[in-house]
């Protein structure tokens, strides 16, 4: 229901691409739950006994057409779905026990390798493998999580960036949004923000205050 309410493609390049975004995005979620890590892998939810678990799924090519319609604004729409879903889940299940005490907000950037010369947004960034610094082509998502003394971390925000992006780019805004998400999820205690030295700048400190 959140997807149906939040996600809108008002000016599609391909009209069929914007049709029924909610069940198409649910197909992506179902595929990820089943182990898919690419668009082609989403076909696994249409085979074997999967149809007894997932109803009304779409072909990978159809999903790809929808995703190519997405812009940064649509990514923000999905972020709002994530925030409201977490808040709604916490109303029904004790996902964050101990949220009335101290909670921990962690932020970090990752480098996820991608392949192919035409991969949108991919660029070379530094990563460490077996203790050695190397350049690797990929995307650098910025991730925030919230946890407590009694609860494992849950994701409060994720944003894809080019592989060469500085770790601290956009961190202040991500932290502010993560704090708002944590409060909406029922965190009433003190929130301690944790990150490495890449986030030790005045804008991040201002967001934490």
Question: What kind of feature is each model-predicted range?
Answer:
Residues 112, 200-201:
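Short, active-site-adjacent cap segments at secondary-structure transitions
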């Amino acid at each position: 229901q959140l997807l149906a309410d939040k996600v809108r493609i008002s000016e599609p390049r391909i009209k069929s691409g914007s049709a029924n975004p909610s069940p198409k995005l649910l197909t992506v979620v179902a595929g990820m739950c089943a182990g898919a890590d690419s668009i082609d892998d989403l076909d696994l939810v249409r085979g074997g006994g999967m149809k007894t678990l997932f109803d009304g799924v779409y072909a990978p090519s159809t999903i790809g057409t929808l995703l190519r319609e997405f812009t940064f604004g649509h990514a923000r729409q999905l972020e709002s779905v994530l925030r409201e879903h977490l808040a709604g889940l916490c109303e029904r299940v004790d996902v964050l026990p101990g949220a009335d005490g101290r909670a921990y907000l962690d932020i970090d950037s990752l480098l996820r390798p991608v392949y192919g010369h035409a991969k949108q947004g991919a660029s070379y960034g530094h990563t460490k493998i077996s203790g050695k610094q190397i350049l690797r082509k990929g995307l650098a998502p910025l991730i925030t999580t919230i946890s407590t003394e009694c609860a494992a971390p849950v994701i409060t925000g994720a944003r894809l960036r080019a592989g060469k992006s500085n770790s601290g780019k956009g961190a202040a805004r991500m932290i502010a949004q993560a704090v708002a998400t944590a409060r909406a999820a029922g965190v009433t205690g003190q929130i301690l923000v944790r990150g490495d030295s890449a986030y030790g700048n005045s804008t991040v400190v201002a967001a934490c205050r």
